[in-house]
């Protein structure tokens, strides 16, 4: 097995181990706090309804020195000046729309104003949604400090597969997806007195569904208040949707920002971004730099180039920091640290509105972001690099004017900004696969999807395709009603395909293996590929690669991780992301609890059986039979159904080219790639999803492929008896 070479062995290893131990202690502390929450909640719930507001929300008599230091900074925020006006309006109205530019303080202060106004009754909470996990965690941490409480006690957070709260929590920051999931077990959101939908301008899929659900709940719960907060002037649309709710405007940008455009479009926006950062560092005054890029690989490569250029040119030191959602929390928090040298933060659009970073004076904006797209006819959902909207460009520029006059360097022409960029990014609901959301709505009893109160109704084609997908997966019957399997599928915080894969795994005696694969697919990528060690990293990955494909490779990684005692050093040596696999381990435990709740047995297959890997692959195929590709020639495949010509993504460990394979992702970049691939036999697909493959609407080449396979299958099965493989 390939091992990572350490340049200065002993000192580096000791430092690395010390850092990893620190991470482990932090993660263990979070886990312990979360576990304690579960046991104390039940006892406390019995008495908290009898408490007064003063007993429920503690009135502290003594505060730390840091509390008073932070308080002075809070009073300088633009939103603080409107505290009394806001409290008056929210007391008099059930719904309030608040527009405040990024940096106005609305995300941290408005929930505290709600508490100060006495609007949270004993045993109830104010829930604040965020579109991104990193924002939910970082803002909860900040607010707990501002209120002089310990994170996870009075102020907590909840993201997918992770919650830090207690029986004393009266303020909770959570992702919009988590609030949507909570509504399935608490349809009237009874635990909340006030709900704040923050960053509503981002129009995520979950936020748009919450608009419709909460609008209906407000009619039944006159004691519930809703605050919709946006960083852009889409307020008129929100006001109209919520029956002319009052609008409060809060100024945000404290200082002017000078905008610079390029004379012509950059041929390579990454090279142009690096060059611009070096020019700023060489020729401009003090102040930190924020660069917007589209994804993890771009960001890591650009950080390395900036560091190398700075070093080779003999420039003053500059701390270059990456920021993206899958980055470990302890690394994300470094962007808030103060340091003597200039900071250059290279980020996805997570820094556009979700996080406020003090000290930014210069912004570099290439004008691109990764955006989700969905083709309902081909059922292909992809992340594409696409131009941003004018609203996003203005948000990015606004990051530079927080603490003093700033500059924004746009790596595109003024003409492109004025004539080519759209005004607002299209709502996610208009460009997403809706199968998961439709399943949740059906579970909530929303059967008339066509007349559901969407702010922007999705095209009928998208809803029809979502219903078709759920029907083929067995979640809906022929009348469109939720089946027993569909009801169980809705309980998993997963895509319907993964849920189906889990449910059928018990029948084939491999639920433990499928749990592992589902968990690994739900966590960040476990393989690390540093720019300077790519050959060694690729060699290390090959030692885990499975002959049959990437899903089984993930199983190998997890088993090796457990066999080696979850050792961070072992992960480091083998170019594995320790935190990602630990997260997968935590996800696995939660998914196992859901299986147990529905009395689905946790069993492992006999690894020595000739059917061991076949049963695992059949379970994967039971969820992903709609994502099949057939080999057409050497390295070229075509996808069944939409007949797209595709090739394997370079990251796959499947070196041979099987006739048929299933894939998890369709990736559109310079090529049409399929990623996370496993070899399957077509007769399995006919056995697992006969109704899907009997469709008359398939295009010609797909029909011919299916008919040919059916003839081969019927011919081979008539000449031999096929026993059950469920052993």
Curated annotation (Swiss-Prot):
UniProt keyword Glycoprotein present:
no
Cellular component terms, GO, for this chain's entry? spliceosomal complex
In short, the EC number is 3.6.4.13
Q: What SMART domains does the record tag this protein with?
A: DEXDc, HA2, HELICc
Catalytic reaction(s) noted:
ATP + H2O = ADP + phosphate + H(+)
Residues annotated for ATP binding in this entry = 100-107
- Could you list this entry's UniProt keywords, alphabetically sorted: ATP-binding, Helicase, Hydrolase, mRNA processing, mRNA splicing, Nucleotide-binding, Nucleus
Biological process annotations from GO: mRNA processing; RNA splicing
What is the protein name stated in its UniProt record? Putative ATP-dependent RNA helicase DHX15
């Amino acid at each position: 097995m390939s091992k990572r070479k350490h340049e200065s062995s002993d000192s580096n290893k000791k430092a690395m181990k010390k850092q990893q131990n620190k991470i482990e202690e932090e993660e263990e502390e979070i886990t312990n706090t979360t576990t304690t929450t579960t046991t104390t909640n039940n006892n406390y719930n019995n008495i908290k309804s009898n408490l007064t507001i003063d007993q429920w929300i503690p009135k502290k008599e003594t505060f730390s020195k840091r509390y008073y230091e932070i308080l002075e900074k809070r009073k300088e925020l633009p939103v603080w000046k409107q505290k009394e006006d806001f409290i008056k309006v929210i007391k008099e109205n059930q719904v309030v729309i608040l527009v405040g530019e990024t940096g106005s303080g609305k995300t941290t202060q408005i929930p505290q104003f709600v508490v100060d106004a006495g609007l949270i009754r004993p045993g109830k909470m104010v829930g604040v949604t965020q579109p991104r996990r990193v924002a939910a965690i970082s803002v909860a941490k900040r607010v707990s400090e501002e209120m002089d409480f310990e994170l996870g006690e009075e102020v907590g957070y909840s993201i997918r597969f992770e919650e830090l709260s207690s029986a004393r929590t009266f303020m909770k920051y959570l992702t919009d997806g988590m609030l949507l999931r909570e509504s399935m077990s608490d349809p009237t959101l009874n635990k909340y007195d006030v709900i704040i939908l923050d960053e509503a301008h981002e129009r995520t899929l979950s936020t748009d569904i919450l608009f419709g659900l909460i609008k209906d709940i407000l009619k039944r719960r006159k004691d519930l208040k809703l605050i919709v907060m946006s960083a852009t002037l889409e307020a008129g649309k929100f006001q109209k949707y919520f029956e002319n709710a009052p609008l409060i405007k809060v100024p945000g940008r404290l200082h002017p920002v000078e905008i610079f455009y390029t004379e012509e479009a950059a041929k390579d926006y990454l090279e142009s971004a690096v060059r611009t950062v070096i020019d700023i560092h060489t020729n401009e005054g003090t102040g930190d730099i924020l660069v917007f890029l589209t994804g993890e690989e771009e960001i890591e490569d650009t950080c390395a180039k900036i560091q190398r250029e700075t070093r080779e040119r003999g420039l003053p030191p500059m701390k270059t920091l990456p920021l993206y959602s899958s980055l470990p929390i302890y690394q994300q928090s470094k962007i808030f640290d103060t340091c003597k040298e200039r900071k250059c933060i290279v980020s996805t659009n997570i820094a556009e509105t979700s996080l406020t970073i003090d000290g930014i004076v210069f912004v570099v904006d290439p004008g691109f972001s990764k955006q989700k797209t969905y083709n309902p006819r081909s059922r292909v959902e992809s992340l594409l690099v696409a131009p941003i909207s004018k609203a996003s460009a203005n948000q990015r520029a606004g990051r530079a004017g927080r603490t003093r006059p700033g500059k924004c360097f746009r790596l595109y022409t003024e003409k492109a900004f004025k004539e080519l960029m759209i005004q607002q990014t299209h709502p996610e609901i208009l460009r997403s696969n809706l199968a998961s959301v439709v399943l949740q709505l059906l579970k909530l009893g929303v059967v008339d999807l066509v007349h559901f109160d969407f702010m922007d109704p999705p095209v009928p084609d998208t809803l029809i395709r979502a219903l078709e997908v759920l029907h083929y997966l067995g979640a809906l019957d022929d009348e469109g009603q939720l089946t027993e399997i569909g009801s169980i599928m809705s309980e998993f915080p997963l895509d319907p395909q993964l849920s189906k894969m889990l449910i059928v795994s018990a029948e084939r005696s491999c639920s433990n293996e499928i749990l592992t694969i589902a968990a690994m697919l739900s966590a960040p990528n476990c393989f690390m590929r540093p720019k300077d060690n790519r050959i060694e990293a690729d060699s290390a990955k090959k030692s885990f690669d499975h002959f049959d494909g990437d899903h089984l490779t993930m199983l190998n990684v997890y088993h090796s991780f457990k066999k080696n005692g979850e050792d961070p050093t072992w992960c480091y040596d083998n170019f594995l992301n320790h935190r990602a696999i630990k997260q997968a381990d935590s996800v696995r435990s939660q998914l196992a609890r859901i299986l147990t709740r529905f009395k689905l047995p946790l069993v492992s297959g006999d690894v020595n059986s000739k059917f061991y890997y076949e049963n695992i692959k059949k379970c994967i195929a039971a969820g992903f039979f709609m994502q099949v590709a057939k080999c057409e020639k050497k390295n070229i495949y075509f996808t069944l159904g939409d007949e797209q010509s595709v090739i394997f993504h370079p990251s796959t460990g499947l070196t041979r080219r099987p006739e048929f394979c299933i894939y998890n992702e369709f990736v559109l970049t310079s090529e049409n790639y399929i990623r996370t691939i496993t070899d399957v036999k077509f007769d399995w697909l006919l056995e697992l999803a006969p109704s899907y493959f009997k469709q008359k609407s398939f295009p010609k080449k797909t029909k011919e492929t299916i008919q040919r396979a059916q003839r081969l299958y019927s011919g081979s099965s008539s000449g031999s008896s096929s026993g059950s493989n469920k052993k």
